[in-house]
A protein has these predicted regions:
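Extended Gly/Ser/Thr-rich low-complexity repeat segments
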Residues: 10-11, 188
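Predominantly recognizes leucine-rich repeat
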Residues: 1-4, 13-155, 163-181, 192-213, ...
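Conserved nucleotide-binding/hydrolysis modules and their immediate coupling elements
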Residues: 158
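Calcium-binding acidic motifs and repeat modules
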Residues: 7
């Protein structure tokens, strides 16, 4: 199903006995039900028992939509953008199932939901709304999925309501727990009896607690059933967690998160939770040490026997990580330590299953004692200079590499003390290196045959020697004045290297793509490019103001795409480019500043006839003769060309299938004769052409299927007879003076009509009221101001 769906669903008018309507194959990103479906078609299907509007992005529904649909038993609004349910939903006395999951804009339910006396299944998981009081009055409700309770200052009755709901399934969130007064009140929630809740979130916010013992008692009584699988505790205000949190009886608990318990000074004994796979501990500001208590007291089971991912973050006072050395974390695959500025203790030494290690913002943490990481694939270090030292010290690095024989990716960021990286001893398994913000780094000359897949250097001042890499990115290396691209490199990107002057290429380079951005002192491309880079297919130059010409001999013959932007001297000397020698060139883009008018008046600039896509900005001397020579041209983008009017009058290549005219301020009309020559044109887009007042009354190409007009402030109308019978889509956007559409109506071929920000036109197109509505009502997809009609 797609936008509007009127065309597909209008036949339902004749199916008054239809019992089930479940649209499938919804386009997830942008799909709406039209007003014609909601107002005219659905209310006629009075025999419907099951209706799904899932994934449609409508924000509003007619308030009386369900008045005539009283037989509905199943209704699905999941994944919609609906903000409010129609009040008429409360007349659906036969409704048994209502699905509202992932309705992220829905904030409340209708007040009289208790009238749904037969409602048995309600799913509000991941919806924005909070569960209202009156849901407890739904006596037939057997299954409530994804309930979210927001407690307030008068929370006693709310906890009682929660306690009365024995039919909770899936996820349950309880927010505002700071309003719970004592143990007796939290006991009313009856949490242990909620056997079908699998995901539980408990959240406190606001002021500090008056009594930490009371806070612990409250959490103690919120102990869930042992069937729980995921548990989130956020903002807990006690100083210590209750004992149940680490009880091995929680044999199904897989995912646990403890965050923002800023007064808590110890962690619970979590090591004996038998199935725990994912553990996050964040924002526990009073924790100074992870002690033996964290691992639990059992002597027969390895602590954290099932844990696969462990994250510590924002632990501002944490200093020591106590290690048992009893085989803890035997299957741990990912370890992340982030924002622990005082952590100085060592990590567990034998993490043989670890595949990804991330250390960030831990300035005191050191890895001077090698740890066993025999299966490590990814190692990321950021803002942790003492960890970075391990790469600087060849002996220490060699020792550590003995335990990292499977390493694939190395990422080092902002380790300012890092001065060297012993490339010669890097393992052959290493394929990706990213180094950023290490200003003192000087790479040694590689002496082995290591060849990476990716190498990225950002903010490293002197990368004089580089290992071979298939993909190479160098950015913001401000002290770099000359650069040799090594062999085996296939794609190269060089950005923001302010002092780069000389760029050269090693023999044997198989480069296919070269991008250079913002290197304003670079005065030339590598010499002998044609011979040294025979495989180059893509060249992009952006803001390289000192480059005046291409190398002697020209560009490589196999070049297919050339993009030149903000390279004034180079573009003004384009007569010497000799692009006509490039038989494979398909795509050419030139973004200029308009300074070529005097320099190249009367130019004779040649391009190869192989070009299929041409994009031009601010090029004043582009001629019609040159364009006509491009006999294979399919796409033309013309932005701010003062001569655009004459180019259209003199004619464009008849091979064009797509033409975009942007910001051509002198364009006042579209010449009929010039357009009629474009017999293959499918898509015409006109934008920001403020002098354009009208379209030709006749002469639009008979092949045209899509017409888009945007930001043309002086355009007043569309031609009475000028829209071709082939047109299937028309878009008009922000044309404030357009006040009419053709009186004869739209071509019958049109299936998509989009009109937005046209204030004079909008009243004429109002759904079921506007004067022009009868002439467009047959069009399957209509959007007026982004609203489906």
């Amino acid at each position: 199903m797609g936008d509007g769906d009127f065309g597909k669903l209008k036949t339902l008018n004749k199916l008054e006995q239809l019992r089930t309507l479940l649209p499938i194959n919804i386009q997830l990103r942008w799909c709406h039900l039209s007003k014609r479906v909601l107002h005219d078609i659905l209310p006629r299907l009075t025999s419907l028992r099951a209706l799904s509007l899932s994934h449609y992005k409508n924000e509003e529904l007619p308030n009386d939509l369900f008045i005539k649909l009283k037989h509905l038993r199943f209704l699905d609004f999941s994944w919609t953008n609906i903000k409010k349910l129609p009040d008429s939903i409360c007349v659906l006395y036969n409704l048994e199932t209502l699905l509202l999951s992932y309705c992220s804009y829905l904030k409340e339910l209708p007040l009289h939901m208790e009238k749904l006396i037969n409602l048995r299944h309600l799913d509000i998981s991941e919806a924005y709304l909070t569960t209202p009081l009156h849901l407890s009055k739904l006596k037939s409700l057997h299954v409530l999925v994804g309930a979210k309770f927001l407690l307030s200052g008068r929370s006693g009755s709310r906890m009682e309501d929660l306690g009365e709901l024995h039919n909770l399934y899936g996820s349950l969130s309880i927010l505002g727990l700071q309003h719970v007064v004592d143990r007796r009140e939290s006991l009313k929630a009856n949490m242990r009896e909620k056997k079908h809740v699998e995901r539980l979130s408990l959240e406190w916010s606001g002021s500090d607690a008056d009594n930490s013992r009371t806070e612990r008692d409250i959490l103690d009584e919120l102990q869930p059933n042992t069937n729980i699988k995921e548990l989130r505790i956020t903002g807990y205000r006690g100083t210590k967690f209750p004992n149940w949190l680490g009880d091995p009886s929680f044999h199904k608990l897989i995912d646990l998160s403890l965050s923002n318990g800023k007064d808590c000074y110890s962690l619970p004994a979590l090591g004996q939770l038998p199935c725990l796979k994912f553990l996050t501990i964040r924002g526990m500001h009073q924790i100074t040490e992870v002690t033996e208590e964290f691992y639990g007291s059992s002597s027969s089971t390895k602590p954290f026997n099932s844990l696969e991912q462990l994250e510590f973050a924002e632990m501002l006072e944490w200093k020591q990580w106590g290690v048992l050395g009893k085989g803890e974390f035997p299957v741990l695959e990912e370890l992340s330590i982030d924002g622990c500025p005082k952590l100085i203790g060592k990590l567990p030494e034998n993490l043989s299953s670890l595949r990804r290690l991330r250390i960030s913002k831990c300035p005191e943490l050191s890895l001077e004692t090698p740890i066993q990481l025999s299966n490590l694939k990814e190692f990321e270090v950021a803002n942790s200079p003492k960890v970075g030292v391990v790469f600087d010290d060849a002996q220490l690095f060699t020792s550590q590499l003995e335990g990292m024989k499977q390493i694939v990716k190395l990422d080092i960021t902002d380790c300012k003390s890092l001065a060297s990286l012993p490339i010669s001893i890097l393992p052959s398994t290493l394929k990706r290196i990213r180094i950023s913000g290490c200003r003192e780094l000087k790479l040694e000359a590689p002496i082995n045959a290591i060849c990476l897949k990716e190498l990225s250097l950002v903010g490293c001042d002197s990368p004089e020697f580089l290992p071979r890499a298939r993909s190479l990115s160098v950015r913001s290396c401000n002290n770099l004045t000359r650069f040799l691209i090594p062999t085996a490199t296939e794609t190269v990107s060089i950005r923001d290297c302010d002092n780069l002057e000389i760029l050269s290429v090693a023999c044997g380079t198989q480069m296919t793509s070269l991008h250079i951005y913002n290197c304003e002192k670079l005065n030339s491309l590598p010499e002998h490019m044609q011979q040294l880079l025979p495989s180059l297919k893509e060249l992009k130059l952006v803001n390289c103001s000192q480059i005046e010409s291409f190398p002697v001999g020209g560009l490589p013959f196999n070049l297919q795409q050339l993009w030149i932007s903000c390279c004034k001297k180079l573009v003004n000397g384009r007569k010497e480019w000799h692009l006509q020698r490039l038989p494979c060139l398909r795509d050419l883009t030139i973004h200029h500043d308009g300074s070529d008018e005097v320099v190249l008046a009367g130019e004779k600039w040649e391009l190869p006839c192989s070009i299929r896509r041409l994009s031009i900005w601010n090029l004043k001397t582009l001629s019609s003769q040159l364009l006509k020579s491009l006999t294979s041209l399919e796409y033309l983008f013309a932005n701010n060309l003062p001569q655009m009017q004459s180019l259209l009058e003199e004619g464009l290549p008849s091979s064009l299938s797509e033409l975009k005219l942007f910001r051509n301020h002198d364009l006042h009309s579209l010449p009929t004769e010039g357009l009629q020559r474009l017999t293959w044109l499918r898509h015409l887009e006109i934008r920001d052409c403020h002098s354009l007042q009208s379209l030709p009354e006749s002469g639009m190409p008979s092949s045209l299927s899509k017409l888009t007009i945007q930001h043309c402030s002086n355009l007043q109308s569309l031609p009475e007879s000028g829209l071709p019978s082939s047109l299937s889509e028309l878009r008009i956007w922000n044309c404030s003076n357009v006040q009419s559409l053709p009186e004869s109506g739209m071509p019958p071929s049109i299936s998509n009509l989009y009109i937005s920000k046209c204030p004079l036109l909008k009243p004429l197109l109002e759904f079921n009221k506007g004067d022009y509505w009868p002439k467009i009502a047959h069009i399957p997809t209509i959007f007026i101001d982004l609203e489906s009609q």
